[in-house]
Amino acid sequence: VRPAPADGGMAAEQMADAIRSADQSAGVLRLYGNYGGDILNFDMAGDLVEFDEITCTTVLLTDDVASAPPEEHEKRRGVAGMVYAFKTAGAAAEEGRDLDAVTAIAQKTADSCRSIGVALSPCTVPQAGKPTFEIAGDEIEMGMGIHGEPGLWRGKLRTADEIATARMERLLTDMPLSGGD
């Protein structure tokens, strides 16, 4: 749990406080999605905790296939892949692995993840007091980002089978799978 500024955003000092709280003299893995504000604030937080002699590593999630083509993978947003990276990194840390090993496992997980979102309705961030985007009740948007960033397409609601097929086609086209995977 981390406190947020009044505008709903995160500040570097709050992230530095979270890093300090998490540190148990073994270093801290910063694991987050590829969003400009998060990168800026986590980088600044890392600089701040260097004064406390806290070692930090970073794994940046870029799993959202809707946000950039494969050849621009580094521009992709981080979305659902974070859940898996959190789980594998947490399990490795719980086993007592060192920071480098935990980071390597989280990075391998991040590199193996692909995701694509589907939006049916917006959420309302309490601090903002308004929906993050607008969409009609009979519409769907494939690939919308978690902050309401535009997706690949918006259209009339489709069946669950049609949506699943469209998502799987996009994911499987993007994933470097081979026999036995």
Question: Can you name each region flagged by the protein language model?
Answer:
Residues 23-30, 181:
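Short, surface-exposed connector motifs at secondary-structure boundaries
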Residues 1-25, 165, 172-174:
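Glycine-rich oxoanion-binding loops at beta->alpha junctions
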Residues 67, 93-181:
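Mixed-charge interfacial surface used for oligomerization/domain docking
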Residues 3-4, 28, 56-57:
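Hydrophobic anchor at the start of a short beta-strand
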Residues 46-52:
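Short, surface-exposed basic-aromatic patches at helix termini and helix-loop junctions that form
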Residues 10, 23-24, 37-42, 53-103, ...:
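Active-site histidine-anchored catalytic micro-motif
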Residues 5-8, 32-35, 75-79, 153-161:
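Hydrophobic alpha-helical scaffolding
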